[in-house]
């Protein structure tokens, strides 16, 4: 990937990724993706490829749900963070409740581990974020700015 900090007259907030794809086997990644996606392994690999090659393409929301412990959910989220580096952020309910969101609103992936939706407003906020086309970003001491949100 050819990362550019400025595209035309716009600042590119996407962070460069420090590793490049290479030919060869990837048994550990294949095993993890196969474990998470099961029969939908090819879909999972396509999803990861699209995230890498077309980061601005709107993709479906992934939701990993299991009442069982030690199923690999957190391991998969950590893998996504290692793969996409600074373009991934881990959020908690408090992050979504804060009026200041500039640190996460422009990320490729916003991952949430062990979310507890005890308040109706939390689930409504997540529902809104997962379906909206644009979102207002706010940083401390700065005006709100509307961005495309995918």
Language-model features and meaning:
Residues 2-111, 123-126:
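P-loop NTPase catalytic core of nucleic-acid-dependent motor ATPases
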Residues 100-105, 138-150:
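AAA+/SF3 P-loop NTPase mechanochemical coupling elements
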Residues 114-116, 133:
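Conserved Walker B
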Residues 116-117, 127:
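Catalytic acidic motif of RecA-like/P-loop NTPases
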Residues 119-121:
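Active-site-adjacent loop/helix micro-motif of nuclease/hydrolase catalytic cores
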Residues 123-145:
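Conserved catalytic/switch belt of AAA+ P-loop NTPases
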């Amino acid at each position: 990937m050819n990362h550019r900090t400025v595209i035309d007259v716009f600042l590119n907030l996407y962070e460069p990724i420090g590793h490049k794809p290479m030919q060869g086997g990837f048994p550990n990644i294949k095993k993890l993706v196969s474990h998470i996606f099961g029969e939908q392994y090819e879909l999972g690999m396509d999803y990861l490829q699209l995230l890498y090659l077309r980061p601005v393409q709107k993709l479906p929301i992934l939701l990993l749900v299991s009442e069982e412990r030690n199923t690999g959910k957190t391991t998969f989220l950590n893998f996504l963070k290692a793969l996409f580096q600074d373009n991934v952020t881990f959020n908690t309910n408090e992050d979504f409740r804060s009026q200041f969101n500039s640190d996460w609103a422009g990320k490729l992936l916003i991952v949430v581990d062990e979310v507890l939706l005890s308040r109706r407003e939390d689930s409504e906020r997540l529902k809104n974020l997962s379906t909206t086309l644009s979102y207002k970003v706010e940083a401390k001491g700065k005006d709100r700015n509307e961005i495309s949100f995918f």
